């Protein structure tokens, strides 16, 4: 996303322009939970359409939140991973998950173990061990 596509110079608006759609942080969550391929992410419970997933992966890559490498045995297979920039989204995810767990606990049970793991990993070194 180039600077000309941002709505304003507001930090919140710019952040939402980059990761504020309903899929980007779920992709980041999946990568933090250990998913690495398009297929693994496509099979997530939320059911993202393949065209949307491809678009979000491209956008996250353009914005240097994720990167990828090709499998040695099959150039069509890409393994995605979080960059340093992507790893820093950890705190945003943690706070959104805490908020949801507090106010909508019945909707927050699927990833409670992940939330607990994130809550206990507070240093950057520890965050990398989550991935």
Can you describe what each PLM-predicted range is?
Residues 23, 64-65:
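Glycine-centered, phosphate/nucleic-acid-interacting loop/turn motifs that mediate DNA/RNA or nucleotide
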């Amino acid at each position: 996303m180039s600077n000309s596509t941002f709505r304003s110079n507001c930090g919140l608006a710019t952040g939402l322009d980059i990761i504020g759609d309903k899929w980007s942080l779920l992709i980041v969550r999946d990568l933090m939970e250990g998913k690495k391929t398009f297929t693994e992410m496509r099979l997530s419970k939320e059911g993202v359409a393949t065209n949307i997933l491809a678009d979000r992966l491209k956008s996250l890559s353009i914005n240097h939140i994720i990167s990828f490498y090709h499998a040695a045995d099959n150039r069509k297979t890409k393994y995605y991973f979080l960059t340093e920039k992507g790893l820093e989204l950890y705190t945003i995810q943690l706070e959104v998950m805490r908020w949801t767990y507090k106010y909508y606990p019945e909707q927050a049970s699927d990833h409670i173990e992940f939330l607990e793991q994130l809550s206990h990993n507070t240093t950057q070194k520890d965050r990398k061990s989550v991935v």
